[in-house]
Amino acid sequence: MKALLTLGLLLLSVTAQAKVYNRCELARILKRNGMDGYRGVKLADWVCLAQHESNYNTRATNYNRGDRSTDYGIFQINSRYWCNDGKTPRSKNACGINCSALLQDDITAAIQCAKRVVRDPQGIRAWVAWRTQCQNRDLSQYIRNCGV
């Protein structure tokens, strides 16, 4: 009985853990989902963005005390504008999704919402981390030896 309880707790802890992609795995998934060149944004920019926003972690969250919003998932998509978490005052939910969808190991919803973000006038500049860590830099290291 004790062994079954231990096994159950172990399985529960494994399912609660986030998927943390490596850069090449992420680059291949993003390329397969049409992100390379989407709205003029190169694949290396997306990988750089994900590294600096979430360290490639699908379950990353960051609460912003100032406007009481939260950033969700591998791209740290904000609940004030892009998704609904049921907690953020005056949320716009421009992606039309629940924020929990951005925390899945399957990042399809996060990719679709990121595409929606870059269709806005700010484009990829909507992400502070991209402006401070990726913009105007040589990003070739982010996709080097990835076969993409």
From Swiss-Prot:
SMART domains the UniProt entry points to: LYZ1
Location relative to the cell: Secreted
Molecular function terms from GO: lysozyme activity
Signal peptide: 1-18
GO cellular component: extracellular region
Catalytic activities: Hydrolysis of (1->4)-beta-linkages between N-acetylmuramic acid and N-acetyl-D-glucosamine residues in a peptidoglycan and between N-acetyl-D-glucosamine residues in chitodextrins
Disulfide bonds: 24-146, 48-134, 83-99, 95-113
UniProt keyword terms in alphabetical order: Antimicrobial, Bacteriolytic enzyme, Disulfide bond, Glycosidase, Hydrolase, Secreted, Signal
Tissue specificity statement from the Swiss-Prot or TrEMBL entry: Expressed strongly only in small intestine.
EC number: 3.2.1.17
Enzyme class: hydrolase
Active site residues of this protein: 53, 71
Highest taxon listed in the record's lineage: Eukaryota
Domain C-type lysozyme: 19-148
Stored Gene3D superfamilies: 1.10.530.10
Main subcellular location of this protein, as a coarse class: secreted
Biological-process GO terms, alphabetical: defense response to Gram-negative bacterium; defense response to Gram-positive bacterium; killing of cells of another organism
Alphabetized PROSITE patterns for the sequence: GLYCOSYL_HYDROL_F22_1 (PS00128), GLYCOSYL_HYDROL_F22_2 (PS51348)
Subunit structure: Monomer.
Note: Lysozyme C is capable of both hydrolysis and transglycosylation; it also shows a slight esterase activity. It acts rapidly on both peptide-substituted and unsubstituted peptidoglycan, and slowly on chitin oligosaccharides.
Similarity-based family: Belongs to the glycosyl hydrolase 22 family.
Name of the protein this chain belongs to: Lysozyme C-1
Gene name of this polypeptide: Lyz1
